[in-house]
């Protein structure tokens, strides 16, 4: 009986520690890293990118996000990658400029009030 009580106590302690470990949020501050690079993909399939410069990753990389939300790792030193980044930045800038509110010249309106005593 004493043996089973000790065993039960150990199981309860283990379950407590396991539940504490499992309660930790997944992926806290874990960067996305690229370990291999993909070949060039068509620019028309790319909608955005992210630079990976974390010290936790073995190498710097660029992750392109496709229209189908797939991530493609690329070497930032390759010319096609640099060209894509420049074109995507240009696209983003154009979108920001087209959605910015248009400013117009101020209207020169002069408000005048009539003197109630001087009504004609």
UniProtKB/Swiss-Prot annotation:
Domain of life: Eukaryota
One of the record's GO molecular function terms: CCR chemokine receptor binding
PTM per Swiss-Prot/TrEMBL: Processing at the N-terminus can regulate receptor and target cell selectivity. Deletion of the N-terminal residue converts it from an activator of basophil to an eosinophil chemoattractant. N-Glycosylated.
Comp. bias (Polar residues): 93-120
Keyword field: Chemotaxis, Cytokine, Disulfide bond, Glycoprotein, Inflammatory response, Pyrrolidone carboxylic acid, Secreted, Signal
Intrachain S-S bonds: 33-57, 34-73
GO BP: any one term: sensory perception of pain
GO cellular component, one term: extracellular space
UniProt family annotation: Belongs to the intercrine beta (chemokine CC) family.
Subunit and interaction comment: Monomer or homodimer; in equilibrium. Is tethered on endothelial cells by glycosaminoglycan (GAG) side chains of proteoglycans. Interacts with TNFAIP6 (via Link domain).
Protein name: C-C motif chemokine 2
């Amino acid at each position: 009986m004493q043996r089973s009580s000790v065993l039960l106590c150990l199981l309860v302690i283990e379950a407590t520690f396991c539940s504490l470990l499992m309660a930790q949020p997944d992926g806290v501050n874990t960067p996305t890293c690229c370990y291999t690079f993909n070949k060039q993909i068509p620019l028309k399939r790319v909608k955005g990118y992210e630079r990976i410069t974390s010290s936790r990753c073995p190498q710097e990389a660029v992750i392109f996000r496709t229209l189908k939300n797939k991530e493609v790792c690329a070497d930032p030193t390759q010319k096609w990658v640099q060209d894509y980044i420049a074109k995507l930045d240009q696209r983003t800038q154009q979108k920001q400029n087209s959605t910015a509110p248009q400013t117009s010249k101020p209207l020169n309106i002069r408000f005048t009030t009539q003197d109630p005593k001087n009504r004609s």
